[in-house]
């Protein structure tokens, strides 16, 4: 019997794309057949000027997964930070910033309207070099996202440059300034940042390929992700959809993780971040 059959397995950062990839239903079924149980799905950046259409598509995709597959899916909606520099090709920084703020207000409405939309993300700041003005505006947008999350009592997933202790400290202080519990702040695409997460309250979402014995021995206060992209023209650009179940299974078989540890990472931490009760 598969060791994962009765265990929760959650991928905390997935993109699905009916237009360019396999689409929501096929991706979810592949994930489930590999041993996955819960998907946290986020809308992709579109770079076409329409910042809300992808959020509506995300709502539809999560509904499709929950209706047509055994997987439990939840969504986060937001504006990817790279959209700012894209919009600036056609308008001023201030105009682009206002367009993003308007879209984030729409994201807030979706979180309030749908029980399965559980947070705002991915939002943050560019992971590539930008001007001081763009960096400042990106941080202002990120702080506004935190204010929205505080107002509606939800989590936020941050896309930013590579994680450091100083960054975790900065995000923690930013959250506290607006009254948001840092535990509701998830840093996407992390490496081994579990101790820094404990120190500053930020929740690290660690790439499954980087979850190993060293990480698990330090702390189980993290979640796992692939950042799966679902684009047939870009195979291998991110981890495959089967990776979180595969890595979890391997850690169990090696004796690194026991059942209690699996429940901690894949169920309890997810419930804690997103204020949900996973009935699996």
Curated annotation (Swiss-Prot):
GO MF terms listed in the record are: hydrolase activity, acting on ester bonds
- An example Pfam family from this entry, by short name, is TatD_DNase
Q: Which domain of life is it from?
A: Archaea
UniProt cross-references to SUPFAM superfamilies, sorted A to Z: Metallo-dependent hydrolases (SSF51556)
Q: Which InterPro entries match?
A: Metal_Hydrolase (IPR032466), TatD-like (IPR001130), UCP004961 (IPR011589)
Family designation: Belongs to the metallo-dependent hydrolases superfamily.
What is the protein's given name? Uncharacterized protein MJ1127
User: What is the taxonomic lineage of the source species?
Assistant: Archaea, Methanobacteriati, Methanobacteriota, Methanomada group, Methanococci
